[in-house]
Amino acid sequence: MSSSELLTSSYDFTLPEELIATQPANPRDSAKLLVYDRASDEISHVHFYDFEKFIPKNCALIFNDTKVIKARLFGQKESGGKIELLINRALDAHNIHVFTRGKVKIGTKISFGLELFAKIIELLEDGSRVVNFYKNDSILRFEEILPIIDKIGHIPLPPYIQREDNKDDEIEYQSVFAKEEGAVAAPTASLHFTKEQHERVCTKFTHAYITLHVGSGTFKPVECEKILEHTMHSEYYDISDRAKELLDSKVSILSVGTTSTRTIEFYARNKEHQRGEANLFLHPKNKPLRVDHILTNFHLPKSTLLMLVASFVGVDKAQELYKIAIEKEYRFYSYGDAMLIL
């Protein structure tokens, strides 16, 4: 391994702004798909509706069934000042980690309508906050908040999509098999599946679901030059019994997305824990142990997601594939095109 693989600057690249996808492919499976076969070093340029043709025989697919919540809320302080709040994750039953746009201090009360309000209970060093939510002065559990914010909240589009969310995003920024509420970012490789294609794949191939509630940390770039000094964010995961059975067997695994991959690989290193908090950082010096193939989108420069891709192919090959994708005008990021690494 070259020392450059451990430098954040090695994962930088220049992306033309017009290749940042701000709208999804329509239909979903019309997105382009770059297929890279490591054994033959061959690259194929197809569309996602061709995905099934490239799935290796006797391979099991693992999907992330997390569901994006309407985590972006607009409220008002008692002083009358407006404030934006982004739910990041539940720390426990009542304490919710959030980001706020606007100054708040401990004790600040923020009203959102429908008798829902939040109270700031802790200010964290990174500028984020911990809050409790209430309705009619009764403190709410996280699962009690969800049906309320589903009525008044907004889909939290990624920061690089420079537009307001709309009704279409409530459908498009969600996989067709999303089930377990809790994510504030979509597992984007999953977005390419239509309902029909997902059903066909699941009929033809062994499969299972894990849950990883994707947090906003997924968009955070690595800011230190030595990647081994980066502190990885933590997210809640749950390995279903069926997924555990497959992962504990010898079957070849195709992971749908980086979130499924992080979950599978965390479990491979911590088999005594079927659910809990995962904070695994995959990179060329910490390669996958259990995942054989990965379906993924094209990611941000200097991101842990690009470093995860490099854990499969190395940083030089990752940069080569990304250069080809840019030349071929693949669309990047959450609503963009896909890559399958075999």
From Swiss-Prot:
Single GO term (MF): S-adenosylmethionine:tRNA ribosyltransferase-isomerase activity
SUPFAM superfamilies linked to this entry: QueA-like
Pathway: tRNA modification; tRNA-queuosine biosynthesis
Domain of life: Bacteria
Keyword Ligase: no
Coiled-coil portions: none
Catalytic activities: 7-aminomethyl-7-carbaguanosine(34) in tRNA + S-adenosyl-L-methionine = epoxyqueuosine(34) in tRNA + adenine + L-methionine + 2 H(+)
Keywords, in A-Z order: Cytoplasm, Queuosine biosynthesis, S-adenosyl-L-methionine, Transferase
E.C. numbers: 2.4.99.17
GO terms under cellular component: cytoplasm
Tagged with keyword Protein biosynthesis: no
Subcellular location, record wording: Cytoplasm
A Pfam family that the UniProt record links to this protein: Queuosine_synth
GO biological process: queuosine biosynthetic process; tRNA wobble guanine modification
Function: Transfers and isomerizes the ribose moiety from AdoMet to the 7-aminomethyl group of 7-deazaguanine (preQ1-tRNA) to give epoxyqueuosine (oQ-tRNA).
Subunit and partners: Monomer.
Family according to the record: Belongs to the QueA family.
Annotated protein name in UniProt: S-adenosylmethionine:tRNA ribosyltransferase-isomerase
